[in-house]
Amino acid sequence: MSYRENNHKFESKQNTIEVDIIDGCNAKCLCCPRGLRIFPNTMKVMDLELYKKIVDKAYDYGKRVIALFSWGEPFLVQNLSEYCKYAHDKGMYVCLSSNFSMKIKDLEGILKYANHLYVSVSGFTQEVYQITHRGCKIDLVKENIDKINQLLNDGKIDVDTELRYFGYDYNEFEFHLWEEYLKDSKIKVVLQPGNSNPRINLYLLSKGQKPTQWFGKVCWYGDPYYDEVQNVYCSMVRKFTINANGDMVLCCEKAFDDNLVIGNFLEDDIYEMQEKKLKSKQCDYCFMKREFINILKKSEKDLIKQHKFI
């Protein structure tokens, strides 16, 4: 089953808020701007009380799905279960994502408050895995995957778990090893086309150049970009993306760019920030926004004109 054929719950939802509860990641992946350290890796953790206020405001505005990640690794937050529990207890659909290359103390305590979990890998053996996932250990990933399997089998957690295998020209031959490894598991194994090419990025870095191809035809520093990687409708216009400082950013795809902050989520008006998003010249170059506007019902278009679209 391909990534795009796997129409899971998270992608079918439109009322999503994405919150980076930590501004950092332990991995140095060659196809990720965070991993490449194109932007700072501060490891700043969002204060729990700030997070609760953000969740409350988002809930009041109708958001019922929350992803505790954008460009950060949520499992590095020591009290992650408290963040999950707060949103879960409000009745929100809680999503997590991780490289899983770490020791996790209370996996059950975290995942009992989660509804969906992504685990991202790029190999089955350490030799292949470490090409893209620099600084990560595949044995730790498998250890955590085995724990989840046991918890699922014992009925101690009920979380839709998806292992996403980022496929490149050098590693697709190991995808079937994960399929075999999890053939009797409740965990879904999905092949997802990888962004860019880690070997090209490594070459560019060696030449002192910035590898930008990982993101389709992105032009950095506020220039227009064309997303040719994803070819399906994505509700980025409706999605709220919040960084670890509590600021709302234009788009989750470039949430790391401070120049694209459109307001403070708690202090500023939601409708005014959404208006900025809809009027953004940057977004005019993104086909996902155009497709989104094209499929809106007339009533929703009227709401946009009234600045009441969230």
Language-model region placement:
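Accessory C-terminal segments flanking Radical SAM cores
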Residues: 2-20, 187-310
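Conserved alpha-helical substructure of the radical SAM core
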Residues: 1-116, 127, 131-135, 139, ...
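Alpha-helix N-cap/loop-to-helix initiation residues
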Residues: 76, 103, 170-171, 258, ...
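Intrinsically disordered, low-complexity Ser/Thr/Pro-rich tracts
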Residues: 133, 147, 158, 229, ...
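Short, exposed beta-strand "edge-strand" segments with a Pro/Gly-rich flavor and a Y/T-containing core
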Residues: 40-46, 117-123, 259-268
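Conserved C-terminal portion of the radical SAM core fold
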Residues: 20, 61-69, 88-95, 112-123, ...
